[in-house]
Amino acid sequence: MAMRNLLFWFALLTGGPAMAMEISSTAFGPGAPIPTRHTCEGNDVSPSLHWQGVPAGAKSLVLIVDDPDAPDPRAPRMTWVHWVLANLPVDTGGLPEGIETAALPKGTVEGLNDWKRTGYGGPCPPIGRHRYFHKLYALDVVLGGLKHPTKAQVEAAMKGHVLAHAELVGTYEKAGR
């Protein structure tokens, strides 16, 4: 009973239990199809993304969007990287639809996707319905020495510095496939 009382008072005095970090989009829900406008068959613009629950002590955020089902979800051989952003400010709260490089929050570093260019590259699966993971990481550091890093370079730099992780998964299959 004493422990329960202690936990109650701790939660009350600290503002309640810590909220888990979450990422969401107004364009699609968890497990739902990604609208065509965000794909190679549409305007190829990034979806709006929103997050909350970034933990205290976080110094930067990393966003990675990738597809583990490439090239064929029945026999995946690789993970295709669609977007890499590092050093997003922790107070950002999200990104609007179709954000351009010049409009990214100050300090954000754009990494290379698997088309060997920076910026968002939307879903464009050659075969079948693929899953697209929008992964957000809260780090206890601002990553240094990055200039157009690959996903692998960002993941290596953030190793041991992840405070929290959230993900949103959407799907896409080309019309008539």
Regions found by a protein language model. Give the residues of each.
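N-terminal secretory signal peptides that target proteins for export/translocation
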Residues: 1-3
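Bacterial N-terminal signal peptides
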Residues: 5-17
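N-terminus-centered regions that define maturation/targeting leaders and the start
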Residues: 19-177
